Structure formats: C-alpha cells, structure tokens
C-alpha cells in the first residue's frame, strides 16, 4: 500500500493505472476511520481493480466556531485499517498541497443545500463540493463511495456530478451502527461515558417516527412532533434540526406522499451528531 502526499506523485500512479485500463474506486474521508468507512472500502474493493482512500481534514468546509482544529486525527491507525481492507493507495495531502494559494473558485449546488445541514452550517457544502471537485480531478476515479449517514451530502454530490458531467458513478452505502444503534461517526470520540449513553436518543427517536410511518401516519408535523418529544426527554440533548423532506429534492413536505428523508441533527453536550432514515410509501 502506498501513502502519497503530493498531487504530482499521485497523478503519476493513476496515469499508470489508467494506461492499464484499471478501474479505480475512491473513498473520500477526513480520517479517524471506523467501521462505517471500512464498509465503504470493502464495497470499493469488491467493485474495482484499485482502491484509493483520501485522508484530508478539509478546512474550507468548517465554520469559524466549528471543530476543525480539534477534529480527531490518527494516520497510523487509519493506515492500519486501510491496509487490512486492501486499499492500494492513501492520498494524504497537506493543506498547503490542496490550497497552495488563496482559493477564488468555489462549487455551489443550489436548492439541495438550502435545508438541513446546509441551512445550519453556512458554507459547509460549498467547501465539501469544492474539495471533492479537486479530488475528482486529481484522482480521476471510476466510482466514488459515500455513506448514507450524510444523506444530504450524498444527494448534493450526486447532483454536482450529474450537472458537471463528471464521468464518475456515485455509490451510496448504508449507515453502519454500533450494537446499541448509535450511528458510527468519527465525532463519537468526543463523547464522554454519560454523553455516549445519552446519544442513543437519536436512533430511539427515529425508530418511534419510523413506527408511526409504518402504522400509516402521513402528516409530517405529527412525525416531527414524535421525534421532538422523544429528544426533549433527554437532558443532554439540544435539537439543531428535525426535518422531514422529499428524498430527492430535499424540500420540506407537509403530507407524506412519496419517498421521504427524516433527518435530525442534535447536540449531545458540545458534540453535534446527525442521523436519518428514508421511508418509501
């Protein structure tokens, strides 16, 4: 397994692979890898000749009061996981390699970024789309693998790839959970023992909403109330948003008539966690 830090070097390797007509599966990450990332890598390994994982904590997708400086990093552990699951190349550039000068060019995806995390984290998806555009241009993958836990990100990236004619297939992979239901996340490392226990309220509240939908509830306000009521029973939980949106357009819906995304963002202590599920009539 190669670990490469420069655009020049990684392009030389990729040119060789492309000359040999090899397919490339790409998993973009910010590192501190867990079983969720491993599931993406395994899927990429199954479907491609070569697998690349990028590890880069992207500064331009963090707001001024967010956790860029404290985001967990552990390249040794990450490298071990990548090697275990058959990654061919880790691309781990320095910030100065990706952004050697002040960046004037940004990628925005309208409409899909108006709600959910896009509303609560201004500039976040501009940063995500800009860095992924750079990675797609540098790495030239055949397929890219993203987790469904970041459902809005997945929808936004799919639309960006479609609109800008990237010759890349975007593959969404299911949420991976702990045995007690908590969605796997690098930010779970921030939680102390009590917060970790309290964080289970996210999945529990979504389960209640899912049960109501399966029992025939079609009013989105009622579904939202079920989730809010459950979350409010947890003293350490502070709601950032609870949204029921169309799963394609990500626009709010009042009456549930087609496929919807039920998405929540909740602070447990100082840690912001997200979770979701999709429901189809």
Curated annotation (Swiss-Prot):
What positions constitute the catalytic site? 37 (proton donor)
What molecular functions are annotated in GO for this chain?
ATP binding; pantoate-beta-alanine ligase activity
Reaction(s) catalysed by this chain's protein: (R)-pantoate + beta-alanine + ATP = (R)-pantothenate + AMP + diphosphate + H(+)
Output the GO biological process annotations, alphabetical, semicolon-separated.
pantothenate biosynthetic process
Identify the main location.
Answer: cytoplasm
Q: Give an example GO cellular component term for this record.
A: cytosol
Q: Where in the cell is it found?
A: Cytoplasm
Q: Which residues bind beta-alanine?
A: 61
What's in the keyword line of the UniProt record? ATP-binding, Cytoplasm, Ligase, Nucleotide-binding, Pantothenate biosynthesis
Recorded hits in Pfam families, A to Z, give: Pantoate_ligase
Q: Which residues are connected by disulfide bridges in this protein?
A: none
EC number, UniProt record: 6.3.2.1
What general EC class does the enzyme of this chain belong to? ligase
Please give the pathway this protein is involved in. Answer: Cofactor biosynthesis; (R)-pantothenate biosynthesis; (R)-pantothenate from (R)-pantoate and beta-alanine: step 1/1
| Residues engaged in binding (R)-pantoate | 61, 153
Q: Which residues does ATP bind?
A: 30-37, 147-150, 176, 184-187
Q: What does this protein do?
A: Catalyzes the condensation of pantoate with beta-alanine in an ATP-dependent reaction via a pantoyl-adenylate intermediate.
The family note in this entry says: Belongs to the pantothenate synthetase family.
Other notes = The reaction proceeds by a bi uni uni bi ping pong mechanism.
Its quaternary organisation is: Homodimer.
What protein does this entry describe? Answer: Pantothenate synthetase
To which species is this protein native? Clostridium botulinum (strain Langeland / NCTC 10281 / Type F)
């Amino acid at each position: 397994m190669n670990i490469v830090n420069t655009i020049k070097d990684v392009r030389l390797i990729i040119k060789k692979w492309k000359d040999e007509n090899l397919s490339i599966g790409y998993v973009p990450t910010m590192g501190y890898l867990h079983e969720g990332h491993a599931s993406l890598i395994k899927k990429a390994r199954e479907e491609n000749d070569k697998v690349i994982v990028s590890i880069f904590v992207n500064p331009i997708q963090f707001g001024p009061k967010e956790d860029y400086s404290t985001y967990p990093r552990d390249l040794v552990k990450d490298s071990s996981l990548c090697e275990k699951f058959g990654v061919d190349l880790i691309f781990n550039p320095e910030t100065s390699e990706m952004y050697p000068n002040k960046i004037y060019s940004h990628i925005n995806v309208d409409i899909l970024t108006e709600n959910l995390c896009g509303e609560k984290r201004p500039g976040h998806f501009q940063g995500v789309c800009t860095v992924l555009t750079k990675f797609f241009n540098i790495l030239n993958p055949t397929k890219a693998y993203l987790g469904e836990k970041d459902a809005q990100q997945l929808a936004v990236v799919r639309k960006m790839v479609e609109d800008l004619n990237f010759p890349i297939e975007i593959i969404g992979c299911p949420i991976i959970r702990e045995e007690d239901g908590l969605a796997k996340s690098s930010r779970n490392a921030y939680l102390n023992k009590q917060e970790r226990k309290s964080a289970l309220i996210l999945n529990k509240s979504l389960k209640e909403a899912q049960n109501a939908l399966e029992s025939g509830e079609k009013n989105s306000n009622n579904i939202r109330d079920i989730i809010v009521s459950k979350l409010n029973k947890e003293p350490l939980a502070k709601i950032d948003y609870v949204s029921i949106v169309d799963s394609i357009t990500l626009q709010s819906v009042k009456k549930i008539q087609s496929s919807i995304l039920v998405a929540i963002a909740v602070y447990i202590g100082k840690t912001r966690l997200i979770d979701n599920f999709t429901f189809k009539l």
